[in-house]
A protein has these predicted regions:
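Aromatic "clamp/platform" in nucleotide-sugar-dependent glycosyltransferases that forms part
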Residues: 320
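Conserved donor-binding/catalytic core segment of Leloir-type glycosyltransferases
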Residues: 213-214, 218-235, 241-244, 254-258
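A short, active-site helix/loop in glycosyltransferases that binds the activated sugar's phosphate group
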Residues: 152-192, 197-207, 270
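Short hydrophobic beta-strand element within catalytic cores of glycosyltransferases
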Residues: 337-341, 357-358
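Nucleotide-activated donor-binding/catalytic signature segment of Leloir-type glycosyltransferases, i.e.
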Residues: 265-307, 354
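A conserved catalytic-core segment of Leloir-type glycosyltransferases
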Residues: 27, 36-105, 289-290
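A charged, aromatic-enriched C-terminal amphipathic alpha-helix characteristic of glycosyltransferases
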Residues: 376-410
Length: 413
């Protein structure tokens, strides 16, 4: 029996890192490991949780450091001093966490990849270097993948800790391009472990489908088009709006299942304005939707994301960039037709699997809209969606995660 400690800025809500952490937790628990959690925000079991507010990227001092260090090329001495002070504080708390739960292996979840919390990344790096504790860094996205991190005053810290090269540290990435870039930029060998879903357990039928559709104003024969993502610019929700405007349907509506997250309300407002010009009604229902597949199931929410998927007739996934494609895999799991932009990671890591979807290249045309309606009316649609499900089970199931993750964990024995 080994005790594993997950370390992140937050393990809460429905962001991709938290959801994938939950899946790793499920796999490790069912293989005899005990899991514990360290973060600045936690919705994990209280008796397995160690809260340190300074680990959160939204903590005021941490946010101040971020604001002072990005978008400029120099930093004040006081910022450097504060970074080292907080690094020392968080590192001390990591020692306490590992002592309290008798941790054998730590898994930093994106804490050594994206520099939203520089002291946390440095603290984890120093902790691993000082203790030699076995560690598996799960990288979801790197600083060089995002424009907002390119101009910065912390190249020294980025080279030092995002990510570090340490003897007892293994590295896991979620796509092939990230693997190549990590090897090329840092000379770090790594393992590709894709994001997954529990295909061995098909979804149970929701009893709320009729109520949800009626509440949103959909009649039985109306087309329910779902955008199952957060409302942020890289999701390219404009393309989904354009698609709905081109569909020859009675009610041109687009349902968005998630909230805007941490990136403000400018883009959500822009989508509403744009949709209004195109005669499309965009319905934001993120405040009513919780997760049923995370540490905290949001029992206070009226619906789950499962209810929303099962109510939909078509899923749109027009993202310009994704680290992997959780919503794509979810649509496959719930056996929904999906329109997807051929973003780079999809082209390399998902498309070759052979899924039957409606792809497009950056922009939507009337031809795409007509093809979608033809596909929805196809007498073999159910068979195609069943085949997609089997492909999902083959390439992106919990069993695939098990086969790839456990050898990494067991390599420390």
């Amino acid at each position: 029996m080994k005790n594993i400690g997950f370390v992140s800025t937050r393990i809460a809500g429905t962001d991709g890192v938290s959801l994938e952490t939950y899946k790793w937790y499920q796999i490790l628990q069912r293989n005899g490991y005990e899991c514990y959690f360290f973060a600045g925000e936690l919705e994990t079991p209280p008796d397995r949780s160690f809260l340190e507010p300074k680990a959160h990227f939204d903590e005021p001092e941490i946010k101040h450091i971020y604001d002072e260090c990005f978008g400029t090329t120099t930093r004040d001495r006081s910022v450097s001093r504060k970074i080292h002070e907080l690094t020392s504080l968080i590192k001390t708390r990591l020692y306490e966490f590992c002592d309290h739960f008798d941790i054998d292996i730590i898994i930093p979840e994106n804490a050594l990849a994206i520099p939203l919390n520089i002291p946390l990344g440095m603290a984890v790096t120093e902790f691993v270097a000082e203790t030699g504790i076995p560690a598996v860094a799960h990288h979801h996205d790197f600083s060089w993948e995002r424009k907002r991190f390119l101009i910065n005053a912390v190249q020294d810290y980025l080279q030092y800790a995002f990510p570090p090269l340490l003897e007892s540290l293994r590295h896991v990435v979620i796509n092939s391009e990230a693997s190549r870039q990590l090897s090329y930029r840092r000379g770090i060998s790594n393992t590709v472990v894709p994001n997954v879903f529990d295909f061995a357990n098909p979804p149970t039928s929701s009893r709320k489908i009729k109520r949800l559709r009626e509440e949103l104003g959909f009649d039985e024969d109306d087309l329910f088009v779902l955008q199952p993502t957060r409302v942020v610019p890289r999701k390219w929700i404009e393309r989904a709006v354009e698609l709905v405007s081109l569909l020859d349907i009675k009610k041109r509506r687009l349902v968005v299942s998630h909230e805007s997250g941490d990136e403000g309300d400018v883009y959500p407002r822009r989508i509403l304005e744009y949709a209004g010009r195109l005669g499309v009604d965009v319905i934001y229902m993120g405040d009513k939707v919780g997760s049923s597949r995370s540490f905290h199931t949001n029992s206070d929410k009226k619906y789950t994301i499962d209810d929303v998927y099962q109510s939909a007739d078509l899923v749109t996934y027009p993202s310009g960039y994704e680290g992997f494609g959780n919503a794509f895999i979810e649509a496959i799991y719930f056996k929904k037709p999906i329109m997807v932009n051929r973003y780079s990671i999809f082209v390399e890591d998902i498309e070759p699997c052979g899924f039957n979807v409606i792809p497009f290249e950056g922009f939507v045309t009337k031809k795409i809209a007509d093809r979608i309606l033809q596909s929805l009316a196809h007498d073999q649609l159910a068979a195609m969606l069943d085949e997609n499900y089997e492909l999902g089970k083959k390439y992106f199931s919990y069993e695939v995660l098990e086969k790839r993750l456990l050898p990494v964990i067991e390599s420390f024995r």
